[in-house]
Swiss-Prot record:
Protein's UniProt name: Major capsid protein
GO molecular function terms noted in the UniProt entry: structural molecule activity
Function comment: Self-assembles to form an icosahedral capsid with a T=16 symmetry, about 200 nm in diameter, and consisting of 150 hexons and 12 pentons (total of 162 capsomers). Hexons form the edges and faces of the capsid and are each composed of six MCP molecules. In contrast, one penton is found at each of the 12 vertices. Eleven of the pentons are MCP pentamers, while the last vertex is occupied by the portal complex.
Similarity comment text for this entry: Belongs to the herpesviridae major capsid protein family.
Gene (name only): MCP
Organism: Human herpesvirus 8 type P (isolate GK18) (HHV-8)
Location of the protein in the cell: Virion; Host nucleus
Listed InterPro entries: Herpes_MCP, Herpes_MCP_upper_sf
Keywords tagged on the record: Capsid protein, Host nucleus, T=16 icosahedral capsid protein, Virion
Subunit structure: Homomultimer. Makes the hexons and eleven out of twelve pentons. Interacts with triplex proteins 1/TRX1 and 2/TRX2; adjacent capsomers are linked together in groups of three by triplexes, heterotrimeric complexes composed of one molecule of TRX1 and two molecules of TRX2. Interacts with scaffold protein; this interaction allows efficient MCP transport to the host nucleus. Interacts with capsid vertex component 2/CVC2. Interacts with the small capsomere-interacting protein/SCP.
Annotated coiled-coil segments of the chain: none
Amino acid sequence: MEATLEQRPFPYLATEANLLTQIKESAADGLFKSFQLLLGKDAREGSVRFEALLGVYTNVVEFVKFLETALAAACVNTEFKDLRRMIDGKIQFKISMPTIAHGDGRRPNKQRQYIVMKACNKHHIGAEIELAAADIELLFAEKETPLDFTEYAGAIKTITSALQFGMDALERGLVDTVLAVKLRHAPPVFILKTLGDPVYSERGLKKAVKSDMVSMFKAHLIEHSFFLDKAELMTRGKQYVLTMLSDMLAAVCEDTVFKGVSTYTTASGQQVAGVLETTDSVMRRLMNLLGQVESAMSGPAAYASYVVRGANLVTAVSYGRAMRNFEQFMARIVDHPNALPSVEGDKAALADGHDEIQRTRIAASLVKIGDKFVAIESLQRMYNETQFPCPLNRRIQYTYFFPVGLHLPVPRYSTSVSVRGVESPAIQSTETWVVNKNNVPLCFGYQNALKSICHPRMHNPTQSAQALNQAFPDPDGGHGYGLRYEQTPNMNLFRTFHQYYMGKNVAFVPDVAQKALVTTEDLLHPTSHRLLRLEVHPFFDFFVHPCPGARGSYRATHRTMVGNIPQPLAPREFQESRGAQFDAVTNMTHVIDQLTIDVIQETAFDPAYPLFCYVIEAMIHGQEEKFVMNMPLIALVIQTYWVNSGKLAFVNSYHMVRFICTHMGNGSIPKEAHGHYRKILGELIALEQALLKLAGHETVGRTPITHLVSALLDPHLLPPFAYHDVFTDLMQKSSRQPIIKIGDQNYDNPQNRATFINLRGRMEDLVNNLVNIYQTRVNEDHDERHVLDVAPLDENDYNPVLEKLFYYVLMPVCSNGHMCGMGVDYQNVALTLTYNGPVFADVVNAQDDILLHLENGTLKDILQAGDIRPTVDMIRVLCTSFLTCPFVTQAARVITKRDPAQSFATHEYGKDVAQTVLVNGFGAFAVADRSREAAETMFYPVPFNKLYADPLVAATLHPLLANYVTRLPNQRNAVVFNVPSNLMAEYEEWHKSPVAAYAASCQATPGAISAMVSMHQKLSAPSFICQAKHRMHPGFAMTVVRTDEVLAEHILYCSRASTSMFVGLPSVVRREVRSDAVTFEITHEIASLHTALGYSSVIAPAHVAAITTDMGVHCQDLFMIFPGDAYQDRQLHDYIKMKAGVQTGSPGNRMDHVGYTAGVPRCENLPGLSHGQLATCEIIPTPVTSDVAYFQTPSNPRGRAACVVSCDAYSNESAERLLYDHSIPDPAYECRSTNNPWASQRGSLGDVLYNITFRQTALPGMYSPCRQFFHKEDIMRYNRGLYTLVNEYSARLAGAPATSTTDLQYVVVNGTDVFLDQPCHMLQEAYPTLAASHRVMLDEYMSNKQTHAPVHMGQYLIEEVAPMKRLLKLGNKVVY
């Protein structure tokens, strides 16, 4: 017997066995005996024979384990020894199309048969086995001693272990290959369930149908992802799980070309419908929920044989059964093509040969879903043992978003009955509370975002302008009004305004003015897309710069301060909320009360305000000595006006108010009136102290931080009216290159003071110069005299902040902007006063009432109009003041560089900020009808500043303006009122239309004063740092976007016999022969053939194993991402980085990839992590008026939908129009174009920040959660992928049979993995996360039994709407 065995070339070629385990035992026994048969002295010579022995062993043993798995139930497993000769190709199957026999006389349909083309794919798996030469030598050594036998046994064990390692690798490789094949044919359940619904497939693939399908995708993702987790907290969790599993079973196609094959059955003989492949934890949960029906099933004990003879590989289909081998095909089809079919003749074909395959009992868990038995197993242990990732454990990325700092519009309401303490409508949220993955409440405020919102790229308009030029290369040139100041060659302001308004019949309204008057809904409406197009940046006003004879270009000027943000994006109520914050953070107690404000407002709107007050102001023109000289007259006017009307005279002038408070507290005027004046001055002082407290006392280099925080504290913003030499003082102290334009002359050097400034000191010091002053007044051409007549500046007495608070805050609020600049003709004023007989007649008693001696004339008219009865001496003293009065009212244009935090610009003069200062002019109220004729002879309107350009007031000062506003009624609004470009150019000004719009619409209250002060906070990084420190709103909201990653465990369902697996013979080759070892490589050919007539597998996420990111509030550090961007002032740049908390490091540190993922410079710099990997939050600046409902549903963070799958025929042009064309409504919200114009438009701030096109020079590969929503190429790719995905799946699932001309393979379409693992990429939507604008809303939400999303006045809560539904627990309170 031994000799017989010894001569067999391949001993133990096949071992017949009934049980799978016996196969392995017999093969191993044969291997050990075969070791004894090998003879030879040289180990390397023996290795040749050993190679043949190894091939025998692998042929017998391999792939037995696969038959023991439940996964084999989804396959038809066949041994195919000639597989190595086959290449990838197509195999034809013939199927019959069923029909319906009609009973109404219609002709029956003919039988239709189709040829189905199935792709056969080969797979190559292999393993290496390395055997030591010493062990092989021991096998061939003589065994003479017991030690020899011991070494021999040890060598056999060593070699057997190595062989077992290789065989085990191949067996696992087969299982892994089959699982990979199944996954390749397994779309997500939400796709199959939706597209497989005949309700949709019967309607065709129109726009509406595709839109419905995508909506169902989204709904299924949110409602049914991770259904096992959701079932745990349901009252009917088991029924829900059964429903989900039933949907999975129903979604797949059970029809295969192997009809009737029942390879695997239960013990009772019932067919196993399929197999559920999952992970250990999911399997345990399912078993606990559903219970095990049976613990074993009957399956084949060996592979079926498949033999091919001939040149071609043919698989035939007859009677709906797959033939066992080629002989059956030959006998049935080829040899006897005309044979009549019979049951006896076709017994073998009908049985498929399975009656000859021996069966055995296989351990498996079976569950019953509906009426079907399904095997369930987990292969996770196989992967865990090999330390390879399990294919059913997938990492899924979900992007979340939430708002910070939104302002809820009026009327405000509450849906909560338990929240108390935050009822005030003035409370404005500056933070958002979120809950991280460990249920820790975290606050995200502006302090967190400083590393983003303070970065220079956030404050640079250049890229936005370039993007606009590329997107709209041929802009409408426009009218050019308000874009650039035009210097005038002369100093005659009357001529300037007269020439401008004379015959003017056309008014131009710049965009900045238009936006200030529309509502939020109107601005965002599709019909306003032209107006909205240039609203792309929160900090800049963009405009089209006309170029005669050339194409226009886009330019931008800085908005400078918060108040210049258009009202639709920062409404009046919001600014008043910021004012309340200003009061709170500075502990501001208003000195002024509502009564005083009402008196000022009544005075401003008093049609009988004495014109004589302006005459007195003109004679005093801010000079304290002249005020003291004329105190009796001033006291008389104040007392008369107060007694007659209860109103305050001279309240329009800061200097008059200050002088009254300083010199008239001795009872010369009524105590009540003096109290009002003192409250006005006290309010200004209190506001100044509050501003200084808010800004702090730090310095940046040599610049006080106060200059960079508030425009009111910036010395480069001068008061609007000047009577002293503030210009030289500015030039001497400024480092921003100030230029004072006096007509067409530039005063830019203090050394030229004598050329441009004529100082008028005290009257007693000018006694010797009175003749020269008179000669200059009479002889000089004041139109061409480019000299300013002002008094010397007393620095000890000069407080510009109080003056600016008065003119830029108090008066606009109390008068509702009902004021206009006024020029004075001093010569005519003097004539009115002096050319009267009693004034200088010695015969008239100085103490007599002058009205007793005046003849009819202008002076008598204005005195009678004001019911003022001065003495002759009072008028004489007033006339004396004229001796050193200025000659005319003049205008000086003050141009300075912007502060270094606002120095970025699109053009050179955009780096400048300018204002017009009215020299020796005044701010006037409306003039009464009875005084207008007199007023016209002495005064004229000078609309030079947005806060001092009320057209209705100007119309009362001169009939030319009255005729103008009558011809053009739309010019009666101060916001759109056209003024000469020689006086003002709105885009260059400190104050723009939104400030004037607020002043015109606000309620005159102390709160409005605080609001106007806070509106002067600058839109710059130092100001943001200051406001964030004090929890004060900076003027814009933020959309925070964060991507989190979860480790999800999936369920894969495969229907029975849906894949045919062909297993070939192994090939063993020596890969390497060394002196100490021999390496063998075992390669196996495997082929797979999908035999189902549709999708036979489906996958669904069932359980969240872990959340790998912290779901926290860590903000992106743009200083690290864009290290090359910097402010021009290095000291400022370093100050901002320090205050923003930017971690500095060497360039090597910046290159660490962790910095791009988590926003930290290096991992070793972190002492530790508490909640897992830091998830990066990115900031998208957002208007505070954005709809909060937008953040309560899955939406695109850029503010406009970007999913274009609903297009009839996909094209990039259509996709781009839907993305960027704001004349088309947002498909998700038909009432508007966008929810955030600063992010959704071409060239918007969000676009240039996160569109990778604009970051290529920095770090193109940087990780960014916002990139997926902004980078156009990515969006197009995802849209095209989704469009293709829907079309491809619809074509496969439409129900039409596949033919040879429509070769469709039922595999997952490209992009399916992205859809499953990154649904936010594909759907272009982020999910709302639990977020509350105040901690109290979060506490109320967690403590209420019936969970809801409460709204309480200005506070709101956003519930989490996402596929992963978290169990939220704060303390002992749980909310799901």
